[in-house]
Amino acid sequence: MPNLNWSKLNHMQIGRYAEYYAKMEFTSYGYDVYTSEVDDHGVDFVAKSPQGVFLEVQVKAVRDNYVFIRKDKITLDDAHLVCYMRFSDGALPEVYLIPASVWNTPNAVFVSRDYEKPGQKSKPEWGIAVYGAQRSSFRFRTAAFR
């Protein structure tokens, strides 16, 4: 049984745990998982489905309400997935699979931030903003593995 006191882990530890957990989830559904030693293109691993379909996966761990991916690190299509994992103390992580194509039509949950105003220095990003009531209607779950 894993330690479920996630708040005791730092940002790097929770991210590393999330990546391993995601790989185990994919493997448990019969996917082959391929990991690169260097994460310089925004892909944490590649998963090959039992039907032979290859998916590029970016894992994002969150303890609060917002997480983002730099726009230059992901392609907006169905072959690129975000494995969004929400960590709350006392429970196993909630796992959601989100096709990157959702950002082709941004909304209140799947946001686009370009930071083009004077003085803004952040690079453009795609965000996932899940607050309050939105959480219960968040429709992407691990059923997408099947």
Language model features by range: what are they?
Residues 1-41, 46-146:
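Mixed-charge (Asp/Glu-Lys/Arg
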